[in-house]
Structures are given as structure tokens and as C-alpha cells.
């Protein structure tokens, strides 16, 4: 049987995600971000709610990406997620993209010329942002041009890099309907961005979300809910360079900007430069909020939920892969658990995220 991997955030889960799961074959394993997202923001609803949405709509097994995999630039996000899925035995990776290309060929190219390609990136001027450097590399070696704003295409290339040299086939699915950042309501498939923006419009949600009741009942948060705490974390820290990935230049810019910024959005605007993109700045702010330090990634994989089919698969992995299904006295990943505690502060009605929680079980799909 085919074992298909899907890397996702489901922020929140919508019809486009359901379409992706419907297109996937065999046993479907989702490696999902926890409570903080790749582009450096808190999830609109918590990881358990999003895992349940996925399991109700075709996923067989949902596992959690640790905080320091979830909140990363595309390449590191892709690498960390593929590492986890590879250990869970996937033989194909399905993903949505704005531009369906021969990603398998791109992965083979990276297998062959990866060292040369990375050297090319290292030699590019530091005035370029990391995404600009990566795009220059793909243009040089694969003749790829980047048109407009296509974050899923960028992630797809990160997945191609991550599967290079592994026995995993890539299966791109053409993204349906609205673009990633689109807030347009007049489409067949709405984007997660639009759903977050129109979260109080019930008709809109019912049109585009399969598990709308779960979403409506869940406690929700936005970045601004954490601004007072973020401000405190910045002002009370005498040396921000002790925080993961914060260099001297960024530390100075953030300390200066917090004096006048009245919101997270304003802070991001003030700190962003040509070299430091908004997404990168948001990630740095997420690290500061969660007091992230350089950390070893957990060996064990945290299981958020499964169907009967998923449970059988986990059983077959016993002894080969270290799995955590209940976080108790023994921590799974201290960094992720700390981030979860901070996430809960954004809305006091958010349920406990780790202790006493057990995987969600869905009997039928």
C-alpha cells in the first residue's frame, strides 16, 4: 500500500486542504505545525482542533512538527518535516503548488549538484535576503523564474531539496482557487488567509470549510493578542542576541522599534529591511516571544491523532521509531511545550495543550 506524506499547517483547515487529502492515495500521514506557523505567527486555532479537522477529512495519522521545525525558513521547514515523515515510512509526498513542474527532476538535480548549488548560494552577496539567494540558485541551475507571490511553489522546491537522495516520490497537485495570500471571497476555494480574515462571516465559512462547527467553537487568537507579552519579552531582555537566530543588527533594530510600535504589525514594518523579510522578522519575534534558544530537535515523534488505519500503521513501526502519545513527567520537547504554554496566554479559554492530552481517535473516515 502507498504511504503518502503531507506537510501542512491547516491554519485553518479548508476545502483546498480537503481536496489535497482526497487526491492523495493510500495511508495518509500529515506532519503538521503545532501552535506556531512557518511564517512566524500563532495558529488561529490550536493544534488539537486542527488535527481533528484533518482526521475528519481524510488524514489517517497526524503528527506534530516541533516548534523549531515549524517556525523556520522554507528549506529548514521542509527538511525537518521530510525527516519526520521519512522515519514514518512514507514513499510519496503530496503537496499543493501554484505551479506544477517536474519537481522530481528538480530533486534529482539537487541530488547530483547539491554541494555546488549550496556553494553558489554562499557566494552571493549578503545584501540579498535568504529567499532571494535561493531563487537565484534555482534560476541558475534549473532555469526557474519566480513570477509573483507563490509561497507554495517556494515550499515545493524546499520539499524537492529535502527528498533528494531519499526513496520518496513527489506528487504536486495544482492549487485550486484563490492564491495563498488572497482575501477574495468570490472563488471556488478560499485561501486560509481569507478564512482568517472573514472568520466571523458564517456563510463564508460554511462555503469553504468542511469542519466549520469545530472552527466556530474553538478559541481563537491573533498575533496582537500577544503584543503586551512580546513587548515585555523585548524590553526585559538585556541581550536579545541570546535568542535563537537574533543577530546584533536585528537586536538593535527590534529594541529601537519597540519604543514607538503600537502593534505587532507596526513593529514588523519598522524592523523589516530589504535583506530581512517580513516573514523572517515575524519568525524572530516568535522566537523572542517563546524565549527560544538553540536546541536539539527531539528524537521522538509526537502523535496528535489517528484513525484505525493510522493506529495499525503506528503498531507496525513499534520498536523502529520512538513515538510519544502522552506528554507527562517526561517532556517530549521542552521548547515546543514552552511555546504551547505561551500560546495559551493569548486566550485564557484555550485548553491545556500537552499535559493529560492523548491522541485523538477517529473510528471511521
Swiss-Prot record:
Keywords: ATP-binding, Cytoplasm, Ligase, Nucleotide-binding, RNA-binding, tRNA processing, tRNA-binding. Signal peptide: none annotated. It is found in: Cytoplasm. Gene3D superfamilies: HUPs. ATP binds at residues 7-20, 96, 152, 175. Its EC number is 6.3.4.-. One of its GO terms (molecular function) is ligase activity, forming carbon-nitrogen bonds. The keyword Protease does not apply. GO terms for cellular component: cytoplasm. It catalyses: cytidine(34) in elongator tRNA(Met) + acetate + ATP = N(4)-acetylcytidine(34) in elongator tRNA(Met) + AMP + diphosphate. Its main location: cytoplasm. It is an enzyme of class 6 (ligase). It comes from the Bacteria. One of its GO terms (biological process) is tRNA modification. Catalyzes the formation of N(4)-acetylcytidine (ac(4)C) at the wobble position of elongator tRNA(Met), using acetate and ATP as substrates. First activates an acetate ion to form acetyladenylate (Ac-AMP) and then transfers the acetyl group to tRNA to form ac(4)C34. Belongs to the TmcAL family. This is tRNA(Met) cytidine acetate ligase. The gene is tmcAL.
Amino acid at each position: 500500500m502507498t504511504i503518502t506524506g503531507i506537510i501542512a499547517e491547516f491554519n485553518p483547515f479548508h476545502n483546498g486542504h480537503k481536496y489535497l487529502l482526497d487526491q492523495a492515495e493510500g495511508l495518509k500521514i500529515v506532519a503538521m505545525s503545532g501552535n506556531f506557523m512557518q511564517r512566524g505567527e500563532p495558529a488561529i486555532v490550536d493544534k488539537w482542533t486542527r488535527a481533528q479537522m484533518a482526521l475528519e477529512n481524510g488524514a489517517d495519522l497526524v503528527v506534530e512538527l516541533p516548534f523549531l521545525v515549524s517556525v523556520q525558513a522554507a528549506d529548514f521547514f521542509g527538511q525537518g518535516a521530510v525527516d519526520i515523515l521519512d522515519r514514518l515510512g512514507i514513499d510519496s509526498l503530496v503537496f499543493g503548488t501554484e505551479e506544477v513542474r517536474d519537481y522530481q527532476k528538480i530533486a534529482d538535480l539537487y541530488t547530483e549538484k547539491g554541494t555546488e548549488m549550496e556553494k553558489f548560494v554562499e557566494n552571493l552577496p549578503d545584501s540579498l535576503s535568504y529567499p532571494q539567494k535561493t531563487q537565484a540558485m534555482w534560476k541558475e541551475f534549473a532555469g526557474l523564474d519566480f513570477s509573483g507571490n507563490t509561497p507554495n511553489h517556494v515550499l515545493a522546491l524546499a520539499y524537492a531539496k529535502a527528498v533528494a537522495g531519499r526513496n520518496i516520490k513527489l506528487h504536486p497537485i495544482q492549487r485550486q482557487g484563490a492564491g495563498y495570500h488572497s482575501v477574495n471571497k468570490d472563488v471556488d476555494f478560499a485561501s486560509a488567509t481569507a478564512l482568517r480574515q472573514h472568520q466571523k462571516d458564517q456563510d463564508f465559512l460554511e462555503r469553504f470549510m468542511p469542519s466549520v462547527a469545530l472552527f466556530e467553537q474553538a478559541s481563537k487568537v491573533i498575533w496582537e493578542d500577544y503584543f503586551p507579552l512580546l513587548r515585555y519579552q523585548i524590553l526585559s531582555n538585556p541581550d536579545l542576541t541570546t535568542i535563537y537566530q537574533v543577530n546584533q543588527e536585528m537586536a538593535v533594530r527590534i529594541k529601537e522599534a519597540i519604543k514607538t510600535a503600537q502593534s505587532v504589525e507596526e513593529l514588523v514594518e519598522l524592523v523589516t529591511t530589504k535583506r530581512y523579510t517580513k516573514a523572517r522578522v515575524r519568525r524572530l519575534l516568535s522566537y523572542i516571544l517563546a524565549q527560544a534558544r538553540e536546541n536539539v530537535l527531539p528524537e521522538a515523534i509526537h502523535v496528535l491523532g489517528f484513525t484505525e488505519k493510522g493506529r495499525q500503521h503506528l503498531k507496525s513501526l513499534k520498536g523502529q521509531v520512538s513515538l510519544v502519545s502522552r506528554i507527562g513527567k517526561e517532556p517530549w520537547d521542552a521548547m515546543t511545550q514552552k511555546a504551547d504554554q505561551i500560546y495559551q496566554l493569548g486566550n485564557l479559554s484555550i485548553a491545556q495543550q500537552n499535559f493529560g492530552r492523548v491522541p485523538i481517535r477517529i473510528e471511521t473516515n
